[in-house]
């Protein structure tokens, strides 16, 4: 029995019956396009993920799109199941509209360009959610009521002379190391080392043009514009936030040194197109035993608890790198940065999306 030709005929028939793909006849206009991929290894490897951030910008409109996926065995399942598919927002100053798109569900919300009013109850709920999330992040396992302070802080930045092309950008390499010495009242010491592998490119005219368009949009948007992550900095704000959150024993007055770390990288010339950061800790200040492990009950009361109890064995089996792993790894890579023709349809709600507010 010749089954394969029958399948081929059936497939051809289905293809013939399928609705033809809509042709996009909207005009093309110059648009700033900025695309960045951020790979976050997570604190101690927990819940590693990758997010693609893309912006299309004109003087009176902007589309921002985020696609999130887990990169570890466990986080791949969790992130893709809960937040997979990505989301986007379209701001149209010419129409005073803000559309929020859920790309997987094909749904959207509509608000004025500066956003819908947020009820006080919703603000309180969001704050509680952020606080709960902060509690779940891994932290140092240290002695109770023990504090550490910074005894020395040293930066070393070096151009290596190495050059290569990264996503079409002619890039030059810098390496840097930031070494912090932390001590407790018993004179026990921990050494914190943040290493940087940074590739930069001269700020060429296409890049300047893209930034100029974005600045023009922000000026038109007004003071209420909420800035996104600044990917022009070699030291991303997320890294210092995660470091500060993990170092639970560090005195509050010393945390400012973490927040100001990026200023020490001012010797680096050019625009970063690739940055890889690793953070290592070594020592026993405050009896440091590494990341705090969240205990799970034998009968989890939530999906999060059940998934969390599964995470440990999955990570140990499939995600533990050879050698001492870093507490944190973080990579930022620029994929696109310039002005190019883009269809007007990018700034409209796609056909078939359902309004849900």
Predicted stretch roles:
Residues 1-8:
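Bacterial N-terminal signal peptides that target proteins for export
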